[in-house]
Amino acid sequence: MSRRCDSDAVNFRKDGDSPQWPKLIGTAAASSLATLFLVRNFFPAEKKVRHSIRADYTVGDDTFVRTMGNLLGPPLLEGNKVTPLENGDQIFPAMLNGIRSAQRTITFENFLFREGEVSDAFAEALADRARNGVKVHFLQDALGCDAVHGRAIKLMKRAGVAVEIFRFVHFSRINFRTHRKILVIDGVRGFIGGVGIADDWKGTGRTHGLWRDSHYEVRGPVVAQLQQAFMDNWLETRAELLHGDPYFPTQERAGDQTCQIFKSSAGEGSDSGRL
């Protein structure tokens, strides 16, 4: 009896049953890949620096202005005008007005672009300017677009808009995106902020399910820095350098505000945040 029990205990797999170890190995491999994906995309390797924050300067200190320019790259520039825009009912009309007024160039970099009324309006405005001889450059993040081959993108391409998709999604770099929202008109009028080109931002920000957000219209010398920020990812994606007066015209003084465009990217980790 005991021998039969021992035999039954050893020979637990019946004829026709599949072995379990391939499934266990597959599960372990999948878990390892998932862990590697999370670590690679959300916890980039970088040296951790712990320190207290001291108030070394006041905002109006000339030394602060010089230091910020030296550390962050571009200098702080005087003579700008910044107009705050709140929510879709202010932001979208201002941006569309800027696009429709363009005479020479439009550069537009965006993260979120979802098909709907808002994206259709922007696609039609950009397409119209391209048909009228304006050089239109549209750079769209791959992950943020729900229809890379949708009607809006196709409309722009048919009209002559130079459309580029930034970093098609790859497993090991899925989180390396561009979240920049940059629109520059004729090199002299810029828009920057948090809004996406989607119906989710329509209205006043008081409707349930729709976003509240801020954007800014910028005029003056700092627009050249905004244009240069667009050129970073355009050059990476298309290997085309946009230059000359149509993109970088002489900037006139537009107001009395001091501004600086500070750039960051996914590959920089938290270094930019520390600065």
Where are these regions (language model features)?
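Charged, low-complexity intrinsically disordered terminal segments
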Residues: 11-275
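Charged, low-complexity N-terminal segments of organelle-associated membrane proteins
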Residues: 1-7
